[in-house]
């Protein structure tokens, strides 16, 4: 009886990641008997025994224990600790990303075939020097484009990573279409392939940079290197599959340009659709201007804060990667004031670490940030600017803002700085509630993805100034 009781009483337990825990019981002979029924998915369906040290070497010992579950394809292609080590949107994004990569690989094979044909591969009249010159012009154009685009938009890619990711893949399709059409017009071949390579280099900058931003979002255990490495492994596997299919596809389409073009259009449609689904699956938990607009509008109209899932589902993807002209954060102070009187007007009523100038006629807001302005101050400044824009609209507003909007519309037109001062008082009541609602809904307010320039300023403030 005592032995039976010992066999039934768990001595300890263990689990791998978030998997099912297994218990360990004492067997009658003093060995440890581990349960493995919870690991049936890995092909284990019976208990195994670990013998004490010094027992019969012919019996099953510690070496007979099964290897940890993370020993198959999951270990090769998924980050360690999956799914707990990555964001909840990791799997749907990676699945659709693999589909788009496969379609892009096949389209790329068709484009490469067309470029080689245009350069003169298989043509006895083509010269090596002409082909080399074409290739050098194509590559040098792309290199210059890469540098210029990285300088022009590099600092803006974090703010709208999803939109730029989609833009990069669509531009890649355009580049491959140019390559396919290049041999049709031999006189413009060099210019066409150079333009195509320029577009592809822009794609490499935008796509690579936004992929890095998405890796930061997906990695939940400071495992960005692991997530990036496994993403590369997945992409390599997909490209290998695409290469094998291309070997079968190219002989079928090489003699029929119309069929080749039809295959390209089909693969392009699949590529764009899969990209859209992949980007739409992402749930970013930090606020950029587009998501802040959606969340603030919903809050002002209904008094509720949208959670990240709902806001990301509503976020526009086909637009949004160009900065909206209605809100500019981090502008230089000299752009807004040219006299002591204008500076006094701008500072009056501002007890926060920012100065806000509102152009009512064009509904444009420009914000000067103090040296001490932190993420929450910037978030408040952006909320303030978007709230001023809401005064120009016709939708429902909270009672405090509705009263202010009615006063602005009923009486003579007020100076912008007077309205800004009054909205500061309203925001003092609304913003703490809004900020708490954001945090309760799951938004990460300690950081943001708002587009902010590097200009900072200092000015004389009232003693009641608050620094967030």
From Swiss-Prot:
Transmembrane spans: 247-267
Pfam families: UVB_sens_C, UVB_sens_prot
Protein name from the UniProt record: RUS family member 1
Membrane topology: Single-pass membrane protein
Residues with PTM N-acetylalanine: 2
Record's keyword terms, sorted: Acetylation, Membrane, Phosphoprotein, Transmembrane, Transmembrane helix
Modified residues (Phosphothreonine): 49
Keyword Amino-acid biosynthesis: no
Protein's gene: RUSF1
Protein family (similarity comment): Belongs to the RUS1 family.
């Amino acid at each position: 009886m005592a032995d039976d009781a010992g066999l039934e009483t768990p001595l300890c337990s263990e689990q791998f990641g978030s998997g099912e825990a297994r218990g360990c019981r004492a067997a009658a002979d003093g060995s440890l008997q581990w349960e493995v029924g919870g690991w049936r998915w890995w092909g284990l369906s019976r208990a195994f025994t670990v013998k004490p040290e010094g027992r019969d070497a012919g019996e099953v010992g510690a070496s007979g224990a099964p290897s940890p579950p993370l020993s198959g394809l999951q270990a090769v292609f998924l980050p360690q600790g999956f799914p707990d080590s990555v964001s909840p949107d990791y799997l749907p994004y990676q699945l659709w990303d693999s589909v788009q990569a496969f379609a892009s690989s096949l389209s790329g094979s068709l484009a490469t075939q067309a470029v080689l044909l245009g350069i003169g591969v298989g043509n006895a009249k083509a010269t090596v020097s002409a082909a080399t010159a074409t290739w050098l012009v194509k590559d040098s154009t792309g290199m210059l484009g890469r540098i210029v685009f990285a300088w022009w938009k590099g600092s803006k890619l974090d703010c709208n990573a999803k939109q730029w990711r989609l833009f990069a893949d669509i531009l890649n399709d355009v580049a491959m279409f140019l390559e396919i059409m290049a041999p049709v017009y031999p006189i413009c071949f060099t210019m066409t392939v150079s333009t195509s390579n320029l577009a592809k280099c822009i794609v490499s900058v935008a796509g690579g940079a936004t992929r890095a931003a998405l890796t930061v979002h997906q990695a939940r255990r400071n495992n960005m290197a692991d997530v990036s490495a496994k993403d590369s492994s997945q992409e390599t596997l997909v490209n290998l599959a695409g290469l094998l299919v291309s070997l079968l596809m190219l002989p079928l389409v090489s003699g029929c340009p119309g069929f080749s073009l039809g295959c390209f259009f089909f693969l392009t449609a699949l590529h764009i659709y899969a990209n859209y689904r992949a980007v739409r699956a992402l749930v970013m938990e930090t606020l950029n201007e587009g998501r802040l607009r959606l969340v603030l509008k919903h809050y002002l109209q209904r008094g509720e804060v949208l959670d990240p899932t709902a806001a990301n589902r509503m976020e526009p993807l086909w637009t949004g990667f160009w900065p909206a002209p209605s809100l500019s954060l981090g502008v230089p102070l000299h752009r807004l004031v040219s006299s002591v009187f204008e500076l006094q007007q701008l500072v009056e009523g501002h007890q926060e670490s920012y100065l806000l100038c509102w152009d009512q006629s064009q509904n444009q807001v420009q914000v000067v940030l103090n040296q001490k302005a932190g993420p929450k101050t910037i978030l408040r400044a952006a909320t303030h600017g978007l709230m001023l824009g809401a005064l120009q609209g016709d939708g429902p507003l909270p009672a405090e803002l509705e009263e202010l909007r009615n006063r602005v519309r009923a009486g003579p037109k007020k100076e912008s700085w007077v309205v800004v001062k009054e909205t500061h008082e309203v925001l003092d009541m609304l913003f703490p509630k809004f900020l708490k609602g954001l945090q309760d809904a799951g938004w990460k307010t300690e950081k943001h993805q708002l587009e902010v320039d590097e200009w900072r300023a200092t000015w004389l403030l009232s003693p009641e100034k608050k620094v967030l």
